[in-house]
Amino acid sequence: MFSLPALLIGACAFAAAAVAASGDGCRAGCSLAIAAYYFSEGSNLTFIATIFAIGGGGYQALLPYNPAITNPDYVVTGDRVLVPFPCSCLGLPAAPASTFLAGAIPYPLPLPRGGGDTYDAVAANYADLTTAAWLEATNAYPPGRIPGGDGRVNVTINCSCGDERVSPRYGLFLTYPLWDGETLESVAAQYGFSSPAEMELIRRYNPGMGGVSGKGIVFIPVKDPNGSYHPLKSGGMGNSLSGGAIAGIVIACIAIFIVAIWLIIMFYRWQKFRKATSRPSPEETSHLDDASQAEGIKVERSIEFSYEEIFNATQGFSMEHKIGQGGFGSVYYAELRGEKTAIKKMGMQATQEFLAELKVLTHVHHLNLVRLIGYCVENCLFLVYEFIDNGNLSQHLQRTGYAPLSWATRVQIALDSARGLEYLHEHVVPVYVHRDIKSANILLDKDFRAKIADFGLAKLTEVGSMSQSLSTRVAGTFGYMPPEARYGEVSPKVDVYAFGVVLYELLSAKQAIVRSSESVSESKGLVFLFEEALSAPNPTEALDELIDPSLQGDYPVDSALKIASLAKSCTHEEPGMRPTMRSVVVALMALTANTDLRDMDYHPF
């Protein structure tokens, strides 16, 4: 029944594929890479120099890379501070043969800001340049608690040294985490790459990132402080496996072969036991047995699709069917079993995020929450949702191919979204916190009714009650995150804050972070702009300057002022001073009662 030589060949092939796929297969790193650090409120150059272990002059060493900083004591919030660091060829502790390019920055413990001793707390200081999951994978400490004292954490920040298959001209690269509204193309243009040929080159350095907005890390060639590009070092990069990787393949295939022999023995023993006890065949169990046995996960409420069915429906995941790209995977449109669907495709490394979203969406069912249809766990992880065919709120507000929204439509969208959040916060046990509420995650159907989407991707957290706060990793989108989020504190009031920002977006049609120029150095948050207007001697007049001009004055001024005041309450700096979503729904229902919704039957395109 089983061929041992075939098993050995298969084991070696599997090991080789696993090693080749799990890392870059790098042979060497490069002496220099640059990180684009998002400068947030409370940061300073000394702190940045400390967490990047920059010696020999401290923050002074940062100044040659940041000529725009003329006063080290004053850096505008939202600016990117460029930080040099060495880019090395590293191996994962659990699989040394799996190599990848990253900076390994020694992080002293206890933490400089104090009070944190988890990977979440460490990652929170690096403004999306790394994640808690990445730190856990590249360090030996358990995730629950990192010992203090003289210990240290190696902070791994992905980097690039170039690729000889793309161009020999570039060997110095910027590691740039995208924030809301940014894309690979916009960042590349900011650093001088704007022609079609240059953009094609940048996309080759960043496969799969074209058009992605606000999520993920991109690599951009940059000049050194002398204004010169570093050429790629000859032979410094490549995809051939290192000697360590080859050794790893040999060891892995032997180990897999031994395990295979053990499994064969156990299989025959199990068959005998099965015959004696008349137990059912294991083939009756699904790929998610372990997940379905976990508390609260009820996959029987969703359809399990086959990989073949999804592959055929998307025409082999063709670009014609691709409708989106996120930090954890791609989204495709397809018709499955007569229903229009949106299919999120994730790698196996996103198992935790996949299970989190599956757990939530098999529990919650509401008109204003996107509906999960099914899933698949063959080859990759797939979540299948209902397809919402009128885009998202951000697209309508930015008018990317859409006509302006009427005032009545905006008020109804606000109420729909608030009801979805109220359901999560008030009517589900345990309570769920979305953690990434924003206009891009509010989908609109053909009748302009709103549905909240994007629950997974590690942005969903259970809490025991409305008053309880849970410390976890930082997640969310810049511009929508409340002050407490930077310390990993999560409660339903995090969603309330983000919803307040969405209300400001509905009023102004501006993005959560407003740039007064192409440079990120002149950026202000909507929260700041509206608070400034509401504190003016004549709030109504100041507010009129922020209201979306496409409304052409066709809105009730008193209602606009009430929504702005409600948004201000939602974005209060103190979580305890923010209203509950139930209170927000009541306030918006009162507004809709006074708003003429007859034009909701008219849908401009």
UniProtKB/Swiss-Prot annotation:
List cystine links. Answer: 26-89, 30-161, 87-159
A Pfam family: PK_Tyr_Ser-Thr
Catalytic function, reaction form: L-seryl-[protein] + ATP = O-phospho-L-seryl-[protein] + ADP + H(+); L-threonyl-[protein] + ATP = O-phospho-L-threonyl-[protein] + ADP + H(+)
Q: Which residues carry this modification: Phosphoserine?
A: 278
Enzyme group, top EC level? transferase
Q: Name one GO molecular function term.
A: protein serine kinase activity
Q: Which UniProt keywords apply?
A: ATP-binding, Cell membrane, Chitin-binding, Disulfide bond, Glycoprotein, Kinase, Membrane, Nucleotide-binding, Phosphoprotein, Plant defense, Receptor, Serine/threonine-protein kinase, Signal, Transferase, Transmembrane, Transmembrane helix
Instruction: State the InterPro entries in the record.
Output: CERK1/LYK3-like, Kinase-like_dom_sf, Prot_kinase_dom, Protein_kinase_ATP_BS, Ser-Thr/Tyr_kinase_cat_dom, Ser/Thr_kinase_AS
- Can you give the residue ranges of the Protein kinase domain? 317-591
Q: Give its E.C. classification number.
A: 2.7.11.1
So which residues have sugars stuck on them? 44, 154, 158, 226
Designated name of the protein: LysM domain receptor-like kinase 10
Q: What taxonomic ancestry is recorded?
A: Eukaryota, Viridiplantae, Streptophyta, Embryophyta, Tracheophyta
